[in-house]
A protein has these predicted regions:
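Extended, regular secondary-structure scaffolds
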Residues: 206, 218, 227-246, 368, ...
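Hydrophobic, small-residue-rich alpha-helical packing segments that form membrane-like cores
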Residues: 143-216, 220-238, 242-270, 275-277, ...
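His/Glu-based metal-binding/catalytic segments typifying zinc-dependent metallopeptidases
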Residues: 35-37, 44-46, 157, 161, ...
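Non-catalytic, conformational "gating/processing" segments within enzyme and secreted inhibitor domains
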Residues: 153, 205-237, 717-751, 960
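Aromatic-residue-lined binding/catalytic grooves and analogous aromatic/hydrophobic interfacial grooves
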Residues: 439, 443, 702-717, 721-727, ...
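Active-site His/Glu-centered metal-binding helix of metallohydrolases
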Residues: 57, 61-65, 571
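Non-catalytic terminal extensions that flank enzyme cores
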Residues: 1-42, 258
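M16 family metallopeptidases and their MPP-like homologs
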Residues: 40-50, 76-124, 131-142, 169-194, ...
Length: 988
């Protein structure tokens, strides 16, 4: 091919892909193409960007290059693409040693537009000429007048304040620092908030000039496209203008340690949190993963040693009382992968015992051998995931591209980790001959390149750091001359003016845009059929699943009281993690993964669109399996639902402690979701339900039962037994299946026998109930047939939950009453306008929040929220001003086309088989018809400016509900007590 040197080609049969590696002769760019029939095309360009300090220059550059370029001189082309393209993926990511810019689309014209915008962004960005972009995306001094305090602000600055407020993120940062002190991994590529303000504009420009060059680029094309045509365009449009250079971006190996290193750090906890049993102990060791087989084997060891229920290393630490949550595992994707064992909820004084137990346990496993069933189960699970290639909302081509970078960046072939089938076959055989035990000895035991990181709690550390920063900035302000203060004020105002100034229409039109005619008019339909077998409703969706069945047993929770629902929420955590009548929980886990691609238990509330303010609560058993394992899997489901030994108080204590830890970690990682859910619980039955089984109320519940368990360890198990007995009955159940016709037929054939066996289980439980408690015979299980009252809602209120965080998650939620304001597809267009114009401009661009979002449901729920937000009062004021903005909304025809295309892009997200299985249940329970889907799409396509203005009443109603929740900085919440009905410490 002209101007390219073909380095090597391979056929990857597992992926039905023809792969080629090229080098662009003039610029030195590396190109990897993966040609196949997947219409969800992916383009990615990555640069090796080793961090030389912790100013976050790589991360800030990632943000900044997407703020306009020579060919597309808009202020925010990324946002314009987000709201005006049919992308199936659009983002950019900073890693410890690379920065990646991937896009994906199923539309050929759209895909070419996305490639063009991203390539111009990385090679010709405006940010290297305009310091205001660095100020906005990275950091700047902020002072509006002489009386104003001097502050730091910036999107990345605030994002990383949020990251550094999370103890697990802090721990990960210092693990890398401890293991690789002489390499780029010792620095924080995302940026340390204490160091980010040291980044100058000259350093920023120099970083881009050095690393953002084709000679340092790794370009990937994946999918159904004319590769020769794409490469010719790449050459002509961009690569040919560059001459090859040496970017000097090689990442050296860290010289191996000769002895264990130790590092001690602190993390912030609330004023009332305990300092005992609140330390993280982390043992970490650098491992060599020199080929794919070894890489997969280390990942499997992660599961066998740490992640599986009853994993021996995890169990040994828990039983020794060192930590109540053990996690870690194999971390790759960097030059030198490492293996970690982390104990959360430990004491620093136990560090020697922690190391001793790890060493003793591993040596015992090497000597006596690992559980072969556990190894085979882990291999089976990994291979199932690999073959299924279902990565949720991420296109599989993106996952393959990122996997290719795990080797390509370090001088190895990009397809090395994509060939897995033979490796799995070899590992099954090797497991019989001590391969994994030898790996433990070589990589984990006989390896001095290790570090112990101790992360200790410190009360009020966040507040101390905030006060120190305020003092530093006050001193800085006091040391300024009058001219310097005026210059700072002028710069702040100039930046605000720049942020508020809209991009000219002339520049907006330089960005390529599809037309409405490029969009399909037909909504994607649901195709389930309802059938009754043995008087059980089956919801059957027939489609090509490549021999995989997606099976869901759905149990209506109407039989449970409000007091019982949180117990059901905990039940989904317990099932398959305790002994049953036939299996230990360790053997049960292996049996499940030997015969399935995973079994999950979940709870969700589905609004009834035929009866507003009503919903259906469902406890679901979700499993994916190959058809030939159906009989065994159904037997396992019966066993788990009916013979779990809830009376095992020792095991229950372990699960409870881990659940308490994991729920806190979830809140720390996704505070915006919890804030929205909590606010919705004030007025919405579905919101209240989700709060009880997985929100802040559930977190409080877990803490209560954990505290009570020590004094009364038997009641919890009995309560779960009663909940399971009431819930898992035929009168509560319907089944949904997504599979090919032969898979559905196989289920229908086996179901009558399974149901009879299930009935026998229930009869046995009836006898057991008589033995356990004669008073319980009255038959609470028949409550499914009764009409239960809706959940008690607590009415509108604004709550503040203080955490040891430097940023906030600020949510408002409410109801617009669909009987007065009928749901319309125009609300999807309004969502795009708010997410990428109004909220984006006010909360992210001007306010410095990392994220902002809005949403409107078919049943009348609406919400607004911010993510890693330095503000609180200003954000709430922004929400309150929204109805006026919508009433006076104006947009050109081109702008409306963009909003409509963005809304359609969300509707047309490719559906995996697992997505289809979940959506079928949701649509069935909520009564969403194909006609409603088509009507919604028609309304989206026909949305006008007038339609948007008419939605101001909807938003006004949402805000008038008065429900709000803020999770975050105690300093901010305490400073604005008047905004809240109640405030409290979330973590106590």
């Amino acid at each position: 091919m002209k101007n390219y040197e073909l380095i090597e080609t391979r056929r990857i049969d597992e992926l039905s892909t023809d792969a080629c590696i090229y080098r662009h002769t003039k610029s030195g760019a590396r190109i990897f193409t993966m040609k196949n029939t997947d219409d969800n095309k992916v383009f990615s360009i990555a640069f090796r960007t080793p961090a030389e300090d912790s100013t976050g220059v790589a991360h800030i550059t990632e943000h900044s290059v997407l703020c306009g370029s020579a060919k597309f001189p808009l202020k925010d082309p990324f946002v314009e693409l987000a709201k005006g393209s049919l992308n199936t993926f659009l983002n950019a990511m900073t890693y410890p040693d690379k920065t990646v810019y991937p896009v994906a689309s199923r539309n050929e014209k759209d895909f070419e537009h996305l490639m063009d915008v991203y390539l111009d962004a990385v090679f010709h960005p405006n940010c290297v000429e305009d310091p205001r972009i660095l100020q906005q995306e990275g950091w700047h001094y902020e002072m509006m007048d002489e009386q104003d305090a001097l502050r730091y602000n910036g999107v990345v600055y605030n994002e990383m304040k949020g990251v550094f407020s999370n103890p697990e993120s802090v721990l990960e940062r210092y693990i890398m620092n401890a293991l690789f002190p002489d390499t780029c991994y010792a620095n924080e590529s995302g940026g340390d908030p204490a160091v980010i303000p040291e980044l100058s504009f000259d350093q920023f420009r120099a970083f881009h000039a050095r690393y953002y060059h084709p000679s340092n680029a790794y370009i990937i094309l994946y999918g159904d496209m004319d590769m020769e045509k794409k490469l010719a365009w790449l050459d002509e449009a961009y690569l040919s203008e560059f001459d090859a250079i040496d970017p000097d971006s090689d990442i050296p190996l860290q010289p191996a340690f000769t002895e264990l290193h130790e590092e001690e750090i602190a993390y912030s906890v609330g004023a009332h949190e305990s300092l005992t049993k609140n330390t993280y102990l982390a043992w970490n060791v650098v491992v060599d993963a020199l080929d794919n087989k070894r890489n997969l084997a280390l990942d499997i060891l992660d599961y066998v040693l740490l992640s599986s229920p009853g994993a021996p290393l995890k169990q040994a630490l828990v039983e020794a009382g060192i930590g109540d949550d053990i996690f870690g595992g194999f971390e790759d994707g960097i030059r030198q992968p490492y293996f970690s064992v982390c104990a959360k909820g430990a004491d620093a004084k136990d560090k020697k015992r922690f190391l001793s137990i790890i060493d003793t346990t591993l040596r015992k496993l090497v000597k006596e051998g690992l559980d072969q069933q556990a190894i085979l189960a882990a291999i089976n699970h990994d291979e199932f995931q690999y073959r299924e290639a279902d990565y949720g909302r991420s296109p599989k081509g993106l996952v393959y591209a990122l996997t290719a970078m795990d080797t390509w960046l370090y001088g190895r072939e990009p397809w090395e980790y994509l060939f897995c089938t033979q490796c799995y076959q070899e590992l099954r055989e090797d497991a019989k001959h001590g391969y994994f035990e030898k790996l433990i000895a070589e990589c984990l035991l006989d390896n001095p390149h290790a570090a112990l990181v101790i992360c200790k709690p410190e009360r009020g550390l966040t507040e101390k750091r905030e006060q120190a920063l305020e003092k530093k900035l006050a001193t800085m302000k006091n040391g300024m001359t009058q001219a310097e203060r005026i210059a700072c004020i002028d710069q702040t105002k100039a930046l605000k003016a720049y942020q508020e100034e809209p991009t000219s229409d002339e520049n907006l039109r330089k960005l390529p845009l599809l037309s409405i005619s490029d969009i399909g008019k037909q909504a994607e339909r649901y195709h389930w059929e309802e059938k009754r077998v043995e008087d059980t409703l089956l919801l059957e969706t027939s489609r090509d699943t490549r021999g995989v069945m997606y099976l869901r047993l759905n149990f209506n929770t109407q039989c449970l009281t409000e007091e019982e629902l949180p117990y059901a929420g905990f039940l989904k955590t317990v099932l398959a993690y305790m002994d049953t009548k036939q299996h230990s929980f360790q053997d049960l886990s292996s049996d499940v993964l030997l015969h399935t691609g995973g079994m999950n238990f979940d709870m969700n509330a589905y609004p009834d669109l035929d009866h507003y303010n009503h919903y259906t609560g469902i406890f679901s058993v979700e499993v994916k399996l190959l058809y030939e394992h159906l009989d065994r899997v159904l037997a396992l489901i019966r066993e788990i639902l009916h013979t779990t030994k809830f009376e095992d108080t020792k095991r229950m204590a372990e699960i409870l402690a881990e659940a308490r830890s994991r729920e806190r970690m979830k809140i720390e990682g996704a505070g915006h979701s919890y804030a929205v859910n909590r606010a919705s619980a004030c007025f919405s039955g579905t919101g209240r339900y989700q709060d009880l089984v997985g929100g802040i109320s559930y977190y409080h519940f877990i803490n209560r039962i954990a505290d009570a368990f020590h004094a009364d360890p038997t009641t919890l198990g009995r309560k779960l037994w009663e909940i399971a007995d009431k819930l898992f009955r035929f009168e509560n159940m319907f089944v949904s299946i997504t599979a090919e016709p032969q898979g559905i037929a196989a289920f229908e054939q086996i179901y009558p026998t399974w149901k009879e066996n299930y009935r026998r289980d229930l009869r046995e439980k009836e006898l057991l109930r008589e033995v356990l408690d004669a008073d319980y015979i009255a038959g609470t299980h028949t409550a499914a047939a009764e009409e239960k009252p809706q959940l008690i809602l607590h009415g509108s209120r604004n709550e503040g939950f203080r955490t040891p965080s430097q940023v906030n998650y600020v949510a408002r939620a409410g109801w617009y009453d669909p009987t007065k304001h009928p749901y319309t597809g125009a609300l999807r267009v309004l969502k795009m306008i708010l997410n990428y114009d109004y909220l984006w401009l006010n909360l992210r661009v001007k306010g410095g929040a990392y994220g902002c979002m809005a949403g409107f449901g078919r049943s009348g729920e609406g919400y607004l929220c911010s993510y890693r937000d330095p503000h609180l009062q200003e954000t709430l004021a922004c929400y309150e001003a929204l109805p006026a903005y919508i009433r006076s909304f104006s947009a050109s025809e081109r702008d409306m086309t963009k909003y409509i295309i963005g809304a359609i892009s969300e509707l047309d997200t490719p559906r995996t088989n697992a997505n289809v299985a979940a959506l079928s249940v949701s649509a069935f329970l909520s009564h969403v018809s194909n006609e409603a889907l088509q009507r919604e799409r028609d309304q989206v396509l026909a949305t006008t400016v007038e339609d948007i203005r008419a939605l101001s009443d909807y938003v006004e109603a949402v805000l008038a509900t008065g429900a709000g929740c803020t999770i975050g900085s105690g300093t901010e919440i305490d400073a604005h007590q008047d905004l809240f009905l109640t405030t409290e410490e979330l973590f106590k």
